[in-house]
Regions:
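A phosphate-binding glycine/aspartate-rich beta-alpha loop in the early core of alpha/beta enzymes
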Residues: 66, 70-86
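C-terminal edge-of-domain segments
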Residues: 126-138, 142-155
Length: 211
């Protein structure tokens, strides 16, 4: 019988605002090869300005061009270029306390989206496999930000269930929907779905379908 999945946590502190870390070797160093017996690993991070490059993108770029790819994003979205995100006094989604601490990092959010960074990726757990964790806002106001990433080593993955959720959209061809809005109730539906699945370790994969 295969052992249960193993979850490990790694805390990172960047030295530069834009920084790339190869995570597989970092986890091996920090946790003394605890993951060695697991054939696959799932890496995830809850940050919105730091995430992972997809495995297929790393393969297309090649290890030698990952840094150039990140630098290109930095040039496309320069810091402090008047992004609406950074005009904190106009943002109705923030209260006074949040405005006092909210970083002006609109460029990092745009680079995350345009660069195809992911909050969660899976990789074979083998020598030579490259896992790229990219921090796009590692230093803010001269202070390094602390990032927490997790890895789950596992032997196999199976689909526990599927559910279809309805998201109302406007008639305009371009729309933005906050999936966390309580009025939609999506998170509550997902929580009930997870509870019914009764899975100890798993992930939710959300995708859009055209109706």
């Amino acid at each position: 019988m295969a052992p249960p999945p193993l979850e490990l946590v790694l805390e990172l502190s960047a030295r530069e605002r834009f920084e790339m870390v190869e995570l597989r070797s970092r986890f091996s160093t920090e946790h003394d090869e605890s993951l060695a017996s697991y054939p696959r690993c799932l890496y995830w991070s809850a940050h919105t300005t730091a995430g992972f490059l997809d495995r297929s993108l790393i393969a297309r770029l090649g290890p030698g061009r990952v840094a150039s790819y990140i630098e290109t994003l930095r040039h496309i979205f320069p810091e402090g270029a008047g992004y609406a995100h950074d005009r904190l006094e106009r943002r109705k989604d923030l209260d006074a306390a949040q405005r006092a601490v909210e970083p002006r990092n609109g460029d990092s959010h745009l680079a995350f989206i345009a660069g195809g960074l992911q909050p969660c990726v899976t990789h074979p757990n083998r020598a030579g496999e490259i896992v790229c964790f990219v921090d796009l806002d590692g230093v803010n106001d001269g202070r390094p930000r602390r990032r927490q990433t997790r890895v789950i080593g596992y032997h196999r993955e199976a689909v526990a269930g599927q559910i279809r959720l309805k998201v109302p959209v406007a008639g305009h061809p371009i729309d933005s929907i906050n999936l966390k809005a309580r009025s939609l109730g999506l998170y509550e539906e997902l929580a009930e779905f997870v509870a019914r699945a009764d899975v100890g370790k798993g992930r939710l994969h959300l995708s859009l379908i055209h109706i």
